[in-house]
Each structure stands twice: as structure tokens, then as C-alpha cells.
Amino acid sequence: MSENQNPPPSPEEIEAAMSANAADELNRLQGELAELKAKSADLADQFLRAKAEAENARRRAEDEVAKARKFGIESFAESLLPVCDSLDAALAIENATAEQLREGSDATLRQLMSALERNKVVIVNPEAGTKFDPHQHQAISMVPADQEANTVVSVLQKGYLIFDRVLRPALVTVAAPK
């Protein structure tokens, strides 16, 4: 035997070494577990905060929409108040002449048209000969006419658009095919 050879470890030494390794491994795993638990708790907290923030944002958005619906017409209503004032003033006159009534009605109509225009309401009043547009016109009847077929002959009632969306189509008569 050479001097460099160590005697084989005894079973007790092997068991002690394994116990020491197991204890070290257990300590390492317990430390890792504690670290992961802390990270998990932190992530759970972050999740709950994010969830609460999302819920608050949703609630704020719902409140904003409710307020917009409730007060969205406020500007439009304010623009109609001068029209109401003019009508009240006209009704207060007891002995108005037909000419005064006509002038007052014209002025009130101009106020109303101005209020509609300020609120982006546009009149649809096609001229005779305009091509019939089913998106903006509603044909009430077709009549024989000396113009191209499917064109407007006359307007029975004006239509209105708001931001290119039809509020009411113009009621028109349309030239029948020849």
C-alpha cells in the first residue's frame, strides 16, 4: 500500500457526510422556498393592486359616460334658449299684424337654423334633378317627369344629418323611369 491512500471511510463517516450534505441542501431549499413565498406574496399584492386599479378605471369610465349622456345635450339646449325667448316674446304680443308675425317667425327660424348649425345639424334639401340617394332621401312616390329617372322631382319635407348620420331623411318624389 502506498502512503497516499486513505483508508475507506467508515459507514458512520459516510452517514455523517450525507447528513451534512442533506442538511446543507435542506437549508438551501428552505431559503429558496422562503424567497419564492416572499416573491409570490409580492406578486399577489401587485395583482390585487392592479385589479383594484382596473376596477377603479372602469368605474371612472362608466361615470364619465353617464355624465356625458346626462349633460351631453346641455350645449344644444343652451343654443335653443334664444329660440324659446323669441317665441315667448311673440306670444306676449296681443295685437300683432300678419306682417309682424311673419317677420318674427322668420327671425325665430333663423335663430333655430343657427342653433342647429352650431350643433353640426345639416339640412338635407335636394334640388330638383339631384340623383336620388337612398341613404339621405326617402321616396314617397314616383311620378312621370321630364328629367332623368331616379332623380328628385320635389321635396315634400326636408331631412337632417348630424355628423353625416341621418337624423331624418328628406321626403321626396322621384322621377319614374320612362
Swiss-Prot record:
<comment type="function">
    <text>Participates actively in the response to hyperosmotic and heat shock by preventing the aggregation of stress-denatured proteins, in association with DnaK and GrpE. It is the nucleotide exchange factor for DnaK and may function as a thermosensor. Unfolded proteins bind initially to DnaJ; upon interaction with the DnaJ-bound protein, DnaK hydrolyzes its bound ATP, resulting in the formation of a stable complex. GrpE releases ADP from DnaK; ATP binding to DnaK triggers the release of the substrate protein, thus completing the reaction cycle.</text>
</comment>
<keyword id="KW-0143">Chaperone</keyword>
<protein>
    <recommendedName>
        <fullName>Protein GrpE</fullName>
    </recommendedName>
</protein>
<dbReference type="InterPro" id="IPR009012">
    <property type="entry name" value="GrpE_head"/>
</dbReference>
<dbReference type="GO" id="GO:0051087">
    <property type="term" value="F:protein-folding chaperone binding"/>
</dbReference>
<comment type="subunit">
    <text>Homodimer.</text>
</comment>
<dbReference type="GO" id="GO:0051082">
    <property type="term" value="F:unfolded protein binding"/>
</dbReference>
<dbReference type="GO" id="GO:0005829">
    <property type="term" value="C:cytosol"/>
</dbReference>
<dbReference type="Pfam" id="PF01025">
    <property type="entry name" value="GrpE"/>
</dbReference>
<dbReference type="InterPro" id="IPR000740">
    <property type="entry name" value="GrpE"/>
</dbReference>
<comment type="similarity">
    <text>Belongs to the GrpE family.</text>
</comment>
<keyword id="KW-0963">Cytoplasm</keyword>
<dbReference type="GO" id="GO:0006457">
    <property type="term" value="P:protein folding"/>
</dbReference>
<feature type="compositionally biased region" description="Pro residues">
    <location>
        <begin position="1"/>
        <end position="11"/>
    </location>
</feature>
<dbReference type="GO" id="GO:0042803">
    <property type="term" value="F:protein homodimerization activity"/>
</dbReference>
<dbReference type="GO" id="GO:0000774">
    <property type="term" value="F:adenyl-nucleotide exchange factor activity"/>
</dbReference>
<keyword id="KW-0346">Stress response</keyword>
<feature type="region of interest" description="Disordered">
    <location>
        <begin position="1"/>
        <end position="23"/>
    </location>
</feature>
<dbReference type="InterPro" id="IPR013805">
    <property type="entry name" value="GrpE_coiled_coil"/>
</dbReference>
